[in-house]
Amino acid sequence: MRNIDINNRGLGAPGVASQGVSHHITLENLYIHGVGDSQQTVGIAANSAPTWNWTIRNNQIIGAGTGMYLGNSDGNAPFVAGLIEHNLIRDTIGYSMQIKHQTVWSSVPAGMPTGTTTTVVRHNVFSKLSSFVSADGARPNLLVGDQPPSGPGSGNGFEIYGNFFWQNPTEALFQGEGNIAFHHNLMVNASGPAVVIQRHYGSVRNVRIFANTIVARDNGISVTGGQSGTTQRVAGNAVFAANPVSISGADAAQIDNVTGSQAAAATYLNNPGAALGQLDLYPRVGQLQAPALNTSGLSAYADWNRDFNGTGDSWTTRGAYAGTGTNPGWQPQLAIKP
């Protein structure tokens, strides 16, 4: 499905919804609006049955109740091996996007991959700057849930990178559990926390949070509740918040992050406190420089060595960018990232 203007005129129906098992679906260049009559109204929904190999690309979802709702609240409609890239999701009441947790797969439809797969979320813009502020809308911009605790799909995971997270008046920008690689993202939240890794309906498993640039009022990166036998690592980030990095657990560790208060971001970044249009999270000349980060194990992840702009990362600059001075790439804004 491509190149369609979808306006539901506030009548309570989703913009796009799958019915039954579906796979190898592409949704591209859609403009979805008029789906904001309540938090329960969704821009793109895949929550009725197992779905796999969906591509959701270059779409705009404006003012929805929930931008994307992938999987179901009971964990029995797994969303598997998806690619979600270059979308703009803004001004939702609830989540910009949620990928639900999964219970043990009671049955596997023909053709559904049972080996290890990854859902990739990259180069999207998630903004709740103008979201309606109420208890009903207190949701993160992006939330991802755990994989099945055992059996097929239990080794699956998420790779989330190159995204721009902008503001949330009531919640964190990102909340996750399961197996997660989270890298080279830009995050600004003047009203609350940025990254929260904690148990939701499943478990916190192997988590890698590296090379992100974060400016937030409260917690920058918080990691708790790691499952026994798994590891959580926070490395090479530039985090400016009241509590920049907080981790707990015997197998959780942080290393080689540059941290400071929210106000200190102005010492390291070109213009971190500005409004969109002037916002510039690129490092000032000579700032955030450090010896090369130990990247052992990171090459398993897609584009692990590409910064927010897609430039090769030499790992001597902390945060989401690989250089200092003048940003040669896309300036963060509420538009589809090229």
Task: Give the positions of each predicted feature.
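Structural detector of coil-to-beta-strand junctions
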Residues: 3-5, 12-15, 38-45, 67-69, ...
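Short, contiguous acidic/charged loop-to-helix segments that flank catalytic cores in large enzymes
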Residues: 171, 196-203, 222-228
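Surface loop/turn signatures of beta-propeller and other carbohydrate-active proteins
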Residues: 74
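Short, small/polar residue-rich loop motifs at catalytic or cofactor-binding pockets
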Residues: 153, 201-202, 298-300
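Surface beta-loop-beta hairpin patches that serve as ligand-binding interfaces in beta-rich domains
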Residues: 252-254, 263, 269-338
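Extracellular beta-strand solenoids
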Residues: 6, 46, 70, 99, ...
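Extracellular polysaccharide-degrading/modifying enzymes targeting complex plant/algal/animal polysaccharides
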Residues: 1-25, 29-39, 77, 97, ...
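Right-handed parallel beta-helix
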Residues: 2-3, 19-36, 51-65, 78-98, ...
